[in-house]
Design a protein with these regions (language model features):
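Extreme N-terminal segment that seeds HTH/winged-HTH DNA-binding domains in transcriptional regulators
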Residues: 1-54, 58-63, 68, 74-81
Length: 81
């Protein structure tokens, strides 16, 4: 990944991970990569990876099952126009 120096890394990784939830790469109910797997994929610290997972949960894009992991949340249906 090419890093933008003026944007915090957690925000850049969050943007990638949230896009994967929205575009269905991680379908609803699928377990997201662990903090360690995110560290390995993006070359970031575990603290940064945990921040990304926390932000995904706070945004409603993921939920945690204690002792199991973090999972992609079902996305709201788009209103019919």
């Amino acid at each position: 990944m090419k890093w933008e120096p003026e944007i915090p890394r957690w925000k850049q990784v969050y943007a990638v991970m949230s896009e994967r939830v929205v575009d269905g790469t991680y379908p609803p109910g699928e377990r997201l990569p662990s903090a360690m797997a995110i560290c390995d994929e993006f070359g970031i610290s575990q603290v940064t990876a945990k921040r990304v997972l926390t932000e995904l949960r706070q945004a409603g894009l993921a939920y945690m099952e204690p002792g199991i992991g973090t999972f992609a949340s079902p996305l709201p249906e788009a209103p019919n126009s």
